[in-house]
């Protein structure tokens, strides 16, 4: 009999609760059925709201982006302060525990090592009749990464999104992450982005940030 074990974590305000579920042949159908109940069909009420945001960003660019940032993040962001400055990054380093910075650096080494093993390479094979077969692997010139914010910092999201792109050879990596009410980004997120090699960091969150990276605005 095939036996698999999965741990499901449930977070609760004021404390953490972890429920360990043993996934066996006898129990897996019931467990998987419960997981599959989280169907995309229930997302319909969000799709229309997101579609409206996408269209507004595509049509109105920065104006819509800054308005959404004000409404959702309560931050006054404009063309002059949307890009995280080197001074802000330096300040972030002064606020993050040096031990945590070392942990981030060790994680970078481990993650890079893993993705290096996944990397594909170009190859070509010439046949006697002149036919050339092969594979040409070319990295994207530019990649946009989105990192959540809100009530917590997610440095792991930075590393897991940025490092595969770096290993692949992407020339420029930009990152969007939401600001707090003061227009600042979590220090840990900034440190992780700097260590991972992000080229430009924008103070923008939500669907409006993803849309801005996809369609482009004057600032992004």
Q: Whereabouts are the PLM-identified features?
A:
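Short acidic/polar active-site loop segments enriched in Thr and Asp
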Residues: 61, 171, 199
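Conserved small-residue-rich beta-alpha loop and adjacent elements
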Residues: 125-191
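Conserved NAD(P)+-binding/catalytic subdomain of aldehyde/semialdehyde dehydrogenases
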Residues: 197-220
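Short, basic, glycine/proline-bearing loop/turn elements
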Residues: 31-33, 147, 195-200
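N-terminal Rossmann-like NAD(P)+-binding subdomain of aldehyde/semialdehyde dehydrogenases
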Residues: 17-141
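Short, Lys/Arg-enriched N-terminal segments with co-localized hydrophobic residues
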Residues: 1-17
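Predominant activation on well-ordered alpha-helical scaffold segments within soluble catalytic domains
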Residues: 51, 66, 108, 112, ...
């Amino acid at each position: 009999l095939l036996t698999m074990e999965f741990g499901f974590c449930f977070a609760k305000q004021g404390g953490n609760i972890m429920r360990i579920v043993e996934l066996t042949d006898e129990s897996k159908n019931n467990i998987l059925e419960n997981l599959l109940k989280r169907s995309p069909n229930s997302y319909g009420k969000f799709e229309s709201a997101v579609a409206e945001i996408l269209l507004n960003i595509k049509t109105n660019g920065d104006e819509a982006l800054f308005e959404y940032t004000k409404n959702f993040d309560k931050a006054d962001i404009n063309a002059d302060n949307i890009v995280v400055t080197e001074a802000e990054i330096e300040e972030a380093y002064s606020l993050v525990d040096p031990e945590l910075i070392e942990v981030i650096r060790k994680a970078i080494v481990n993650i890079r090592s893993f993705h290096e093993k996944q990397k594909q390479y170009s190859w070509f094979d010439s046949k006697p009749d002149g036919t050339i077969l092969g594979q040409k692997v070319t990295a994207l010139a530019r990649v946009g990464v989105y990192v959540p914010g809100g009530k917590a910092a997610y440095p792991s999201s930075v590393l897991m999104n940025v490092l595969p792109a770096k290993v692949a050879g992407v020339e420029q990596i930009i990152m969007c992450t939401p600001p707090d009410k003061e227009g600042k980004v979590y220090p840990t997120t900034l440190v992780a982005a700097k260590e991972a090699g992000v080229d430009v960091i924008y103070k923008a969150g939500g669907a409006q940030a993803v849309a801005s990276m996809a369609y482009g605005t004057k600032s992004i």
